[in-house]
Amino acid sequence: MRECISIHVGQAGVQIGNACWELYCLEHGIQPDGQMPSDKTIGGGDDSFNTFFSETGAGKHVPRAVFVDLEPTVIDEVRTGTYRQLFHPEQLITGKEDAANNYARGHYTIGKEIIDLVLDRIRKLADQCTGLQGFLVFHSFGGGTGSGFTSLLMERLSVDYGKKSKLEFSIYPAPQVSTAVVEPYNSILTTHTTLEHSDCAFMVDNEAIYDICRRNLDIERPTYTNLNRLISQIVSSITASLRFDGALNVDLTEFQTNLVPYPRIHFPLATYAPVISAEKAYHEQLSVAEITNACFEPANQMVKCDPRHGKYMACCLLYRGDVVPKDVNAAIATIKTKRSIQFVDWCPTGFKVGINYQPPTVVPGGDLAKVQRAVCMLSNTTAIAEAWARLDHKFVLMYAKRAFVHWYVGEGMEEGEFSEAREDMAALEKDYEEVGVDSVEGEGEEEGEEY
């Protein structure tokens, strides 16, 4: 089997985890107590969903997941919630005091007290796997636990499981809406630390998702539940090919192979379509061509940036539901004729396509309409450098005055780490810039030194 272990870190990670596992259970027909009436092979078997769930002899399905937070309140909600019987109590790990939005606390002081326990639990999960494929790490950039503890964990996972792929789903600080003043510090420190340990990071920005909820679902005041349910649809689309049998399945390492042209340039944009409320869906026929087109609309992206200003390096379309390759090819042919979609000249306009026959499932009482087909597009585009540039700018403004730095230094960090992280991010921006430049003058020599 090709198992995946999900690791949910900090409040954002845990709450997205709740939404994802709720959706997985609905998709596979697993009840909140872990029983699965449709499963005939008790205690194992080679069903595709066993990549995400392990089975006990009694026929209970247990998620291959770990929830970690440095303070207990958020995970306590899981312990008392609807799905409390689904998780093994050892999978829900909490500390006593939180990281207080401070990367240094998550990474050094508080984080190191709990890291060995977490790795021990992950080791137990890994031992139950026959062919562990990799890890999915869910976290936010802005929080102390999400940034600090995740980067510590990624470093340790690289040591313990060197060859396994590690994919991140990161909540990127929204341009306008901020939940903490020190978000730019935490984000840049964590990106710098995890850059070499992460194979692929899908970024999601709350503001982009707020706008999608407002615009497409007519929710006036979206809550985190609305946001997380939308995020979970995307995560589900990305992982569907690991959990179901399909026509064109895509596996974890395949994403990396097709989306990451250079090791550092591993931040694909996710776009999902159709995001539509039940009232609207009733009057629209969402053909393959329509939903494919919708993916190239900046309005449907999960990060605020404009791909029309950047160039695409790679593109991966994951369809699910009633979709046949013929329709997909026609839709892609139409896309290629459009001038607004530019590829870098060193990359043939390749689209990787995955097709899965399992139609998208929706949470009952949720906001999304039940549709016959959906598509999730993962595209690696130079436009995402806009997002980094915005963040770097905020970082520089604060760091020029050394604002809030004493909180980090007081927890055992050195000031040099800030400038080091800043330089690394500047280099990342530069990398994106160079990748987008047309390779006319035979750029062989300068690429040699970077990679």
UniProtKB/Swiss-Prot annotation:
Residues modified as N6,N6,N6-trimethyllysine: K40
Instruction: Quote the subcellular location field of this record.
Output: Cytoplasm, Cytoskeleton
- 3'-nitrotyrosine PTM positions: Y282, Y451
Q: What is its EC number?
A: 3.6.5.-
- Kindly list the positions at which Phosphoserine occurs in this protein: S48, S232, S439
From the UniProt record, list the reaction(s) this protein catalyses.
GTP + H2O = GDP + phosphate + H(+)
Q: Where does GTP bind?
A: 10-12, 15, 71, 99, 140, 143-146, 179, 183, 206, 224, 228, 252
Residues recorded as bearing N6-acetyllysine in the entry: K40
Instruction: Establish whether keyword tRNA-binding is in the entry.
Output: no
**Chief site of localization:** cytoplasm
Q: Which residues carry this modification: 5-glutamyl polyglutamate?
A: E443, E445
> What family is reported?
Belongs to the tubulin family.
Q: What is known of its domains?
A: The MREC motif mediates interaction with TTC5/STRAP and may be critical for tubulin autoregulation.
Quaternary structure note: Heterodimer of alpha- and beta-tubulin. A typical microtubule is a hollow water-filled tube with an outer diameter of 25 nm and an inner diameter of 15 nM. Alpha-beta heterodimers associate head-to-tail to form protofilaments running lengthwise along the microtubule wall with the beta-tubulin subunit facing the microtubule plus end conferring a structural polarity. Microtubules usually have 13 protofilaments but different protofilament numbers can be found in some organisms and specialized cells.
Q: What is this protein called?
A: Tubulin alpha-1B chain
Recorded source organism is Pan troglodytes (Chimpanzee)
